[in-house]
Amino acid sequence: MVRDEADIVEASVRHMTRQGVTHLLVVDNGSTDGTLDRLRTLQQELPGLHVGEDREPAFFQSAKMTLLADILRSVGARWIVPFDADEFWFGEKGSLAEALSYSQYKVVQARIHNAFPMSAAQGLHIDSQPHPDVKAAFRPFLGAVVTMGNHDVLRPGNRGADLRLVHVPWRSQEQFQRKITQGLRALEEADTPNDLATHWRYLGRNSPEAMAEMWTHLVSGSGPEEMVWRPRGQLHQLGPRVPDTWLEVTRAMGIPEQGSPGSRGG
């Protein structure tokens, strides 16, 4: 499910195909920035990409993602990976498809590392501290429910945590302010309870001037605690784009390779 992600949706779709994912179902939620046109163009090139449209603007994310997951189950999907346009999934050792094909689990969590633009240097910078939330891929199951934000799935079965994810929530000041405004509006249209998605409410009720100040702090490596997607640890230069393998990401973060001097593996 994507909305106004024209600057990144092609990169994330191509990344998923390089990760060995054979079929992608991407539904556009009323984009006005050319996202749907970009997806339609990609669809002509990538035979495994299936594009749909959702014209309901309200934030019924859990219900919508659960419906899409059930559609995939009904056509024989072996794994379901609910992904956003700003997410780049990896297997910890090998591709995403390889990690899932070897997995003995019913649900596999993905640890999130956020990446941000920085005012002092070109390209993305990745946070070495994992985000406290996770995302989840799962084997299809009749009655499975994808929770809000795709952070979990409600279904029986054993669980693992063998996946990794680079998340690029904010790419420019204009996109930052637009996404916040749209997020708050979608919550209000769905009459979402006040105790859910509180970070969108906090951000969306700031003035444009206050949001501009938050952006300045963000690209300097900080942000208010109420901002969920903010730098939390040491930032490392990742490069102009998200790499194709998790090994490249760990090298950027300065993490020793398994079995190398200074690592704790073995």
PLM regions and their residue ranges:
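Short beta-strand/loop segment that forms part of the nucleotide-sugar
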Residues: 22-30, 52-54
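Short, acidic, metal-binding catalytic loop of nucleotide-sugar glycosyltransferases
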Residues: 14-23
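Catalytic-site signature of metal-activated, phosphate-bearing donor transferases
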Residues: 63-64, 91-266
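Short alpha-helix within the catalytic core of nucleotide-sugar-dependent glycosyltransferases
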Residues: 10-14, 36-40, 90-102
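Active-site-proximal specificity loops/subdomain of glycosyltransferases
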Residues: 36-80
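Active-site beta-to-alpha loop of glycosyltransferases that engages the nucleotide-sugar donor
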Residues: 1-14, 30
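Short acidic/polar active-site loop segments enriched in Thr and Asp
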Residues: 22, 78, 106
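Short beta-strand-to-loop acidic/aromatic patch adjacent to the donor-nucleotide binding site
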Residues: 77-90
